[in-house]
């Protein structure tokens, strides 16, 4: 007797069931779904956010605009849409580190960060990072924040999304915006890591 093993999580199983039903009723096609996924992974994706961060590192006027009105500043670079109708940028520095969560569901600035990672949507992350952000960053991401640095948690919602602007790594003086984007990861813009160092990438 063989035993059936469900390889999907609860949310994945629900999504698959809905997707199958829509296919059967002819409301969508697999090709259409593939195009949407490819668009968010390749055309939008976290590279948009990386360009915003890199520009803020080299352009003081843009950085100031980003601080005052991130939604408009990002829209000026072409990053706007339903999931970016109101975005606030929070800036890491030597005294403060920011981390983003959505405690109610998985609100996320898709136009600049692409598809949210599975862990961001998980109940475990959403509940634990609010109560113990420093512990979650260390245990789940191997990211140890020094005791003297304050950790602030920002709760995204349907009204407002957040993007973390990580500190510019040392040793990048003279780098172009294009080179700097390679240092900016999706995780650093959620706040579960720092930007990469020059030693961690090949420019």
Swiss-Prot record:
Binds 1 Co(3+) ion per subunit. Industrial production of acrylamide is now being developed using some of these enzymes. It is an enzyme of class 4 (lyase). Induction: By cobalt and urea or cyclohexanecarboxamide. Its cofactor is Co(3+). One of its GO terms (molecular function) is transition metal ion binding. Its EC number is 4.2.1.84. InterPro entries: CN_Hdrase_a/SCN_Hdrase_g_sf, CN_Hdrtase_a/SCN_Hdrlase_g, CN_Hdrtase_asu/SCN_Hdrlase_gsu, Nitrile_hydratase_asu. Co(3+) binds at residues 102, 105-107. It catalyses: an aliphatic primary amide = an aliphatic nitrile + H2O. It comes from the Bacteria. Keywords: Cobalt, Lyase, Metal-binding. SUPFAM superfamilies: Nitrile hydratase alpha chain. NHase catalyzes the hydration of various nitrile compounds to the corresponding amides. Heterodimer of an alpha and a beta chain. Belongs to the nitrile hydratase subunit alpha family. This is High-molecular weight cobalt-containing nitrile hydratase subunit alpha. It comes from Rhodococcus rhodochrous.
């Amino acid at each position: 007797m063989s035993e059936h093993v469900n390889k999907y999580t609860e949310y994945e199983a629900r999504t698959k069931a809905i997707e199958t039903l829509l296919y059967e009723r002819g409301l969508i096609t697999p090709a259409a779904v593939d195009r949407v996924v490819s668009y968010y992974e390749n055309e939008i994706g976290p590279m948009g956010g990386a360009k915003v961060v890199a520009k803020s590192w080299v352009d003081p006027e843009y950085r100031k605009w980003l601080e005052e009105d991130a939604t408009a500043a990002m829209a000026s670079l072409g990053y706007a849409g339903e999931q970016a109708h109101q975005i606030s940028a929070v800036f890491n520095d030597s005294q403060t580190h920011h981390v983003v969560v959505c405690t109610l569901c998985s609100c996320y600035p898709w136009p600049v960060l692409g598809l949210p990672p599975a862990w961001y949507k998980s109940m475990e992350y959403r509940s634990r990072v609010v109560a113990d952000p420093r512990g979650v960053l260390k245990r789940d991401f191997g990211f140890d924040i020094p005791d003297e640095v304050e950790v602030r948690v920002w709760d995204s919602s349907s009204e407002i999304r957040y993007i973390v602007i990580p500190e510019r790594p040392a040793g990048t003086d003279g780098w172009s915006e294009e080179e700097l984007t390679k240092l900016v990861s999706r995780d650093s813009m959620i706040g579960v890591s720092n930007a990469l160092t020059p030693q961690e990438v090949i420019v």
